[in-house]
Curated annotation (Swiss-Prot):
Keywords: Hydrolase, Membrane, Metal-binding, Metalloprotease, Mitochondrion, Mitochondrion inner membrane, Protease. It comes from the Eukaryota. A divalent metal cation binds at H137, H141. This is Mitochondrial inner membrane protease atp23. The keyword Isomerase does not apply. It is a peripheral membrane protein. It holds the Pfam family Peptidase_M76. Its EC number is 3.4.24.-.
Length: 238
């Protein structure tokens, strides 16, 4: 007798052709996908596919929430209002007309472009505090651009310095955020370690950076002067 063949109805294995992500927007399918992620039955490709589908499904709601929180922060957040005032004094203008909430396809929180303004990745915002940190981060970029005429494209030292500044001043390296969200459990020199680590990651992502060692070297070259610079604040605010 021929050897028995596996049943066509048996549970499929995760492979290059089956990444473990089930298509569908219904609640049952979504919970099955979440369970597959939690139990390790979904590949990295499948997890990304699940996240993209979720982001597309929630795009309108994510952008609306982001815009509402953006407008609230522009009106009521002390750090955002302070940065807005200092940017305005340098001849710039950042407000709801050029701070955009959009769905992003790459995993980042936001970005700054001198010609267009600030992008906030609505699908990556965890809560209003995260959005406030991201806005402050990018507004420090805008302040640096107006005050120091930063060469974003070619000068890695300029890029490294502004990354150190904005990461240190925006609040994203607060102890609680590092401890509870990122699993960084240092009690001494935590702020400095966080700023340097995240600045190196940002510089590493730039096209003119060769590798991580190159990024680390550039950040170390500008570290002493740039970490001490707290403009437009008198001291590290958050």
């Amino acid at each position: 007798m021929p050897e028995s063949q596996p049943s066509s109805t048996s549970e499929p294995r995760v492979s290059a052709h089956n990444n473990g992500c089930l298509p569908g927007d219904d609640i049952w399918t979504q919970w099955r996908n979440i369970f597959a992620i939690l139990t390790g039955k979904m590949s990295d490709e499948g997890i990304e596919q699940f996240r993209v589908a979720r982001d597309i499904r929630n795009e309108a709601a994510d952008c609306k929430r982001c815009e509402d929180q953006r407008d609230y922060l522009l009106q009521w957040s002390p750090v955002i209002r302070y940065l807005s005032d200092n940017i305005r004094q340098l001849g710039g203008d950042l407000s709801s007309h050029n701070i955009y909430c959009r769905r992003c396809t790459n995993r980042k929180a936001g970005g700054f472009d001198p010609d267009f303004g600030i992008l906030l990745c609505a699908n990556e915002m965890k809560d209003q505090g995260h959005l406030e940190d991201t806005m402050a981060h990018e507004m420090v970029h805008a302040y640096d651009h107006l005050r120091f005429k930063v060469d974003w494209a070619d000068n890695l030292r300029h890029a490294a310095c502004t990354e150190v500044l904005k990461t240190s001043l925006s609040g994203e390296c607060r102890w609680a955020r590092e401890f509870f969200r990122r699993g960084q459990w240092r009690f001494t020199q935590q702020h400095q370690e966080c700023v340097k680590r995240r600045a190196i990651l940002s510089v590493r992502a730039r096209p003119t950076c060769k590798d991580e060692a190159h990024a680390e070297r550039v950040v170390n070259e500008v570290w002493d002067s740039c970490f001490r610079d707290t403009r437009p604040f008198d001291e590290i605010y958050r």
